Amino acid sequence: MALQFEAFCAGGLAPGWSLTVQGHADAGEDKFEINFLTDAGDIAFHVKPRFSSATVVGNAFQGGRWGQEEVSSVFPLTLGEPFEVEVSADTEHFHIYAQEQKVLQFPHRHRPLATITRVRVLSDHQLAQVELAKRGLSWGDGGY
């Protein structure tokens, strides 16, 4: 998969932000993921729509290994169609929406959230837009 978007934040993640990815699901199956990373190399949150099984999977990679997957069978995405995926966070969970429909709620496994300093979007699908939006204090001291 190709790196389509990467953002760094020296101040780290805080509740109240959202990441929205819009594109067209025109490539092969299972070629899209979003990763929230720490400076230590952990993946604090990994979300991947799996077209082959019509599921959305959330997980975390900490201490050199993957945790237990959380899987949602709510899957409003279709290959060959435009898509929108949004990930937002509050103090307890990541919330994942696809086509404006909530598909997964994933509890924070990595704390403090401020140690999450990078977000990457990898995709072989055509992406039209990737946007980080603030709702109050979000990424550290306001810097992306």
Swiss-Prot record:
Residues 5-133 form the Galectin domain. Lens-specific. Located at the interface between lens fiber cells (at protein level). InterPro entries: ConA-like_dom_sf (IPR013320), Galectin-like (IPR044156), Galectin_CRD (IPR001079). CDD domains: GLECT. GO terms for molecular function: carbohydrate binding. The modification Phosphoserine is found at residue 138. It comes from the Eukaryota. Keywords: Lectin, Phosphoprotein. Transmembrane segments: none annotated. Coiled coil: none annotated. PROSITE patterns: GALECTIN (PS51304). Homodimer. This is Grifin. The lineage of its organism: Eukaryota, Metazoa, Chordata, Craniata, Vertebrata. The gene is Grifin.
